[in-house]
């Protein structure tokens, strides 16, 4: 029997293997013959598990980028794809990734087969979720490695992964430190938002990653604003790539169903316009972009305290990864909410049903503008975008026209404007932390303007700095100095490449910082001024500023008119007298008794036990009238106290009655201590000594029947030694 079972199992495995080989051969032949574009996923030469997963996820019709990319990617060609935001680029590389590994018979023993690199953690998480949704019926193992997660757990599971979705910094860390991480068998490399990964912020990181990957592989690059630089393509070793740009000939670089507006507003009225917009759009889902983390936090904290009537969220790169994931999930599931964020949300993230995208601060270039407004009007859904420009930033409109982006000018009626300057001043006055955050937001905004590359648009010298500080509610203008940078051009590149996406992007700077590991004790001893604010806060405002009210406990008077001690100094002739003179207890008999005094409003000392003179007593009135009035006041006080005492006694009696009734009810129900354990005030009425119900546990050889057998021991069978020993123990127990 076992031989036949084994034979059938081997035959079944061989049959299944032949069927898979025949299926793969048929798929390869269909892919080679694929020439016409198809409109539905069911018409593509895909495996049945992939088709079922696509159908269950309600992916039926192909988008333009998917029609052109998927057939070429299935044939193993390198691809450079560009399409508008919200056009389905993620699915355009997820489907070929799964199918190509399946046709190559990739298993867990073959190691890493595909690598997907995303510039931000949130985009990597979203890509991984899509991968799991489409490939859940296949047997591949997939992993997500991003900054903020446990490095040791990732390192242990890394060798078993076939597909990895990652950020550049964490991937390079594993390549340098993980011994079991082998990339020699890599088949596919995919760069999502490739133009962002290829820029200066990830230059050394990407070069280090590519140098450890095999040259012969399939490479695919996707973005809404794609690069065609020969130098960048040579870095990635692309071999005759297919340039696919489905919207290159369109009249606009943004979706046609996106309504785009701009508003010219002074710097001092930006927050007023934003708060008024939120108050009038309570039934919408809105994203507000700002240029720095400090600005995001200041606007969120102040608006949250002013309660505009809608849920507020904030997201920036300085938050922990768990917080960022929770905020992203909450914003995705909410219908009416406002999200204040930096550019970590600008690329690739797919938030459903976003109605408005507001750019409170102008983007650094047109590509950033396209990615920002791409968070709305996705998948043929309508959306709205509003750009707030300063009068000195109107040159940015020419940059938009050069990329075929038309925006409509709107104006705000004076009657609709509401100033929140007084409220911001009140918040900064009451809360020192809000004032500190506002000062940091002020500095970070000016720093971002100073480090921008396009000086025709961003002009720091034309900004009303003092009026801007006043509009934030600050008591004074913080000091800010722009020192001479050693390498100004490099600093601009670093700022535009790394700070625009904050610390969420895993740039090479992050990787270098991770090499210098600090222990928990190092961080504890490095802490300063934990109970108030950071040490550098004092340098934000002029020390002699008359408007600064943040200092608590200031010296008002330096020299006091204190009476000087007169008299000769006591000179002791012996050590005993000197010791006695230094003893307070011994010197008390030489000092007069202390007088208890109190001070009036003018600071005059008045004896506490000063006796009234006869004149003052006569001025108070007739003694009999004083006695009568005093007795009347005391009588009223006693009557009030009597009412309170009666109510207290009444409540105690009611509580005692309630306890007694509760105890009677428990007694009537015949509740045992095992069934009911009284709690609260009832415990006082229950005896502490409760009868024990548990009995001594019987041994294995004792009879479970509690009835008396009268000393009779029943014997059934004594064939074994164990039975005889059991009988002897029973007889001994009966005796």
Swiss-Prot record:
ATP binds at residues 83-90. A motif (Q motif) lies at residues 39-67. One of its GO terms (biological process) is rRNA processing. Residues 70-244 form the Helicase ATP-binding domain. Residues 1-24, 483-513, 652-712 are annotated as: Disordered. It is found in: Nucleus, Nucleolus. Residues 8-19, 692-711 have a biased composition (Basic and acidic residues). Pfam families: CTE_SPB4, DEAD, Helicase_C. The modification Phosphoserine is found at residues 500, 503-504, 545. Its EC number is 3.6.4.13. One of its GO terms (molecular function) is ATP hydrolysis activity. A motif (DEAD box) lies at residues 192-195. Residues 270-424 form the Helicase C-terminal domain. One of its GO terms (cellular component) is nucleus. ATP-dependent RNA helicase required for ribosome biogenesis. Involved in the release of U14 snoRNA in pre-ribosomal complexes. Required for pre-rRNA cleavage at site A2. Belongs to the DEAD box helicase family. DDX10/DBP4 subfamily. Interacts with the U3 and U14 snoRNAs. Associates with pre-ribosomal complexes. The Q motif is unique to and characteristic of the DEAD box family of RNA helicases and controls ATP binding and hydrolysis. This is ATP-dependent RNA helicase dbp4.
């Amino acid at each position: 029997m076992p031989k036949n079972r084994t034979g059938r199992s081997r035959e079944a495995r061989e049959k299944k293997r032949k069927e898979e080989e025949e299926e793969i051969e048929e798929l390869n032949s269909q892919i080679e013959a694929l020439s016409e574009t198809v409109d539905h996923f069911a018409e593509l030469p895909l495996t049945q598990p992939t088709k079922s997963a696509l159908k269950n996820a309600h992916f039926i019709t192909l988008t333009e980028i998917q029609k052109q990319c998927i057939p070429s990617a299935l044939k193993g060609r390198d691809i450079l794809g560009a399409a508008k935001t919200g056009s389905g680029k993620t699915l355009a590389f997820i489907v070929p990734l799964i199918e190509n590994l399946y046709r190559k018979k990739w298993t867990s023993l073959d190691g890493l087969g595909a690598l997907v690199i995303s510039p931000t953690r949130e985009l990597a998480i979203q890509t991984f979720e899509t991968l799991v949704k489409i490939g859940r019926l296949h047997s591949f193992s997939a992993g997500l490695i991003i900054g903020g997660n446990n490095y040791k757990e990732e390192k242990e599971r890394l060798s078993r992964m076939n597909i990895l979705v990652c950020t550049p910094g964490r991937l390079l860390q594993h390549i340098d430190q993980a011994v079991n991480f082998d990339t020699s068998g890599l088949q596919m490399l995919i760069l999502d938002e490739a133009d962002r990964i290829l820029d200066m912020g990830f230059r050394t990181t990407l070069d280090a990653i590519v140098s450890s990957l095999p040259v012969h592989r399939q490479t695919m690059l996707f973005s809404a604003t794609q690069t065609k630089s020969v130098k960048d393509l040579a870095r990635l070793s692309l071999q005759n790539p297919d340039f696919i740009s489905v919207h290159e000939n369109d009249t606009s670089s943004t979706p046609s169903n996106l309504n785009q507006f701009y508003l010219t507003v002074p710097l001092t009225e930006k927050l007023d316009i934003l708060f008024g917009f939120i108050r009038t759009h309570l039934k919408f889902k809105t994203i507000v972009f700002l240029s720095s983390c400090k600005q995001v936090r200041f606007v969120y904290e102040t608006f949250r305290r002013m309660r505009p009537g809608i849920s507020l969220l904030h997201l920036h790169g300085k938050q922990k990864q768990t917080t960022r994931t929770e905020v992203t999930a909450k914003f995705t599931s909410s219908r009416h909410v406002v999200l204040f964020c930096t550019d970590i949300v600008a690329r690739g993230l797919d938030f459903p049903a976003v109605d408005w995208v507001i750019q409170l601060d102008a983007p650094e270039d047109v590509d950033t503008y396209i990615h920002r407004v791409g968070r709305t009007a996705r998948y043929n859904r309508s959306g709205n975008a509003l750009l707030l420009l300063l009068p000195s930033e109107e040159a940015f409109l020419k940059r938009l026209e050069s990329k075929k982006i038309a925006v409509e000018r709107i104006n705000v009626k004076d009657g609709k404007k509401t100033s929140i300057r007084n409220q911001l001043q009140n918040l900064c006055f009451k809360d020192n932390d809000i004032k500190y955050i506002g000062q940091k937001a002020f500095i970070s905004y000016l720093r971002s303007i100073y480090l921008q590359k396009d000086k025709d648009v961003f002009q720091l010298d034309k900004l009303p700095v003092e009026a801007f500080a006043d509009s934030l509610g600050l008591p004074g203008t913080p000091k800010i100095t722009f020192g001479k940078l050693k390498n100004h051009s490099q600093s601009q590149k670093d700022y535009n490449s790394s700070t625009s996406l904050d610390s969420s992007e895993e740039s090479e700077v992050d990787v270098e910082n991770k090499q210098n590991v600090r222990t928990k004790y190092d961080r504890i001893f490095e802490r300063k001024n934990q109970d108030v604010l950071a040490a550098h806060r004092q340098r934000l405002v002029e020390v002699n500023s008359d408007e600064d009210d943040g200092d608590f406990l200031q010296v008002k008077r330096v020299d006091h008119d204190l009476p000087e001690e007169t008299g000769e100094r006591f000179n002791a002739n012996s050590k005993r007298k000197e010791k006695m003179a230094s003893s307070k207890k011994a010197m008390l008999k030489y000092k007069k008794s202390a007088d208890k005094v109190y001070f009036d409003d003018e600071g005059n000392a008045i004896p506490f036990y000063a006796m009234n003179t006869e004149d003052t007593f006569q001025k108070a009135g007739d003694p009999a009238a004083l006695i009568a009035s005093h007795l009347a006041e005391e009588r009223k006080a006693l009557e009030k106290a009597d009412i309170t005492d009666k109510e207290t006694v009444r409540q105690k009696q009611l509580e005692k009655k309630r306890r007694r009734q509760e105890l009677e009810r428990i007694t009537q129900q015949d509740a045992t201590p095992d069934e009911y354990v009284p709690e609260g005030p009832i415990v006082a009425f229950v005896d502490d000594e409760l009868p024990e119900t548990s009995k001594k546990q019987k041994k294995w050889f004792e009879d479970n029947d509690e009835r008396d057998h009268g000393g009779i021991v029943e014997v059934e069978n004594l064939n074994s030694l164990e039975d005889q020993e059991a009988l002897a123990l029973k007889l001994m127990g009966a005796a």
